[in-house]
Design a protein with these regions (language model features):
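Class I S-adenosyl-L-methionine
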Residues: 1-156
């Protein structure tokens, strides 16, 4: 059906526990700290989508749910893409990696991933989340490879 609701995929926002997986060694931040120092109750803090009024460790304001990113990785991959030879599998490129949700999804789905992030804080959060994802079971049962390369940003 053209234009119907069945064309849409819905998933809830990433929970605080999902946002913070792999970040156990980072300090807990208040919503004000996560939004750049706004005070509780000030204009903008209550409606700020990235904070939702909860304490957490991930300072990134728009962490995507892993379930949504896994869905998009599968939808964007060509049929038959899961070749036993990892070198022949699709590559997911995320030029603005943020907190690394797309990379985590790619690892879990068993496809290759290249991510770039200029923001040092976000790059560190993404690195920690990707290291945590390294231990997650993948769809194909093989272990992913994470590489860190210096420069202006970080490449995973």
């Amino acid at each position: 059906e053209a234009g119907g609701a069945s064309r849409f995929f819905y998933t809830a926002k990433a929970s605080t526990s999902e946002r913070d997986k792999g970040l156990e060694n980072l300090p807990v931040l208040t919503p004000g700290e996560r939004s750049g120092g706004r005070e509780e109750g000030s204009a903008g803090i209550n409606g700020y989508a990235g904070t939702r009024g909860e304490n957490g460790r991930n300072p990134h304001p728009t962490v995507k749910p892993i379930s949504l990113m896994r869905y998009l990785v599968r939808r964007a991959s060509p049929p038959g893409a899961w070749d036993p030879d990892m070198a022949k599998r699709p590559v997911v490129l995320d030029c603005f990696m943020g907190s690394g949700s797309t990379g985590v999804a790619a690892m879990v789905e068993g496809v290759r991933f290249v991510g770039c992030e200029l923001g040092e804080e976000s790059a560190e959060v993404a690195r920690l989340r990707l290291q945590h994802a390294y231990a997650l079971p993948r769809e194909d049962g093989e272990a992913p490879v994470v590489t860190r390369v210096g420069g202006q940003g970080k490449l995973f």
